[in-house]
């Protein structure tokens, strides 16, 4: 009887020690992976910051930004509230702090502000067969009797066992 108790006791100790060692092992792997990911993301940010030139305080703004400034002054809306996330004393400080990641800043700097002129809608009298407003009949398939179909958990487990639903063609 003493040997049976000793065997159970040994088994419990082995199980507890193995669980503790597994937890330590997973914690160490998690720590090493997080440091590796932080190092890689730091390298990516450094590479991106080297590629993106920082705008100088006397940076020339595109015409669309000037127009937006004019419309905002007409409406008496403060510029810092609409363009920048963080309040600061100088515009260059708020520009640097408003965009924490360089790729997002790069995306806004590379925008081409060209003037787009739309043609008059009267000139576009194109009666193409693909015009969605001129389609006389369109077909769509809808479920005829949705109340008859009872949801079942097994449809998600095995789609081959699902019963087919009735569909009918409807003209719109």
UniProtKB/Swiss-Prot annotation:
Disulphide linkage map: none
Transmembrane segments annotated in the record for this chain: 9-29
Basic and acidic residues bias: start-end ranges: 64-89
Subcellular localization, as worded in the UniProt entry: Cell membrane
Biased composition (Low complexity): 91-103
Gene Ontology biological process: cellular response to erythropoietin; erythrocyte maturation; erythropoietin-mediated signaling pathway; positive regulation of erythrocyte differentiation
One cellular-component annotation, GO: plasma membrane
Function: Acts as a signaling transduction factor of the EPO-EPOR signaling pathway promoting erythroid cell differentiation.
Name of the protein described by the UniProt record: Regulator of hemoglobinization and erythroid cell expansion protein
Organism this protein belongs to: Homo sapiens
Lineage: Eukaryota, Metazoa, Chordata, Craniata, Vertebrata
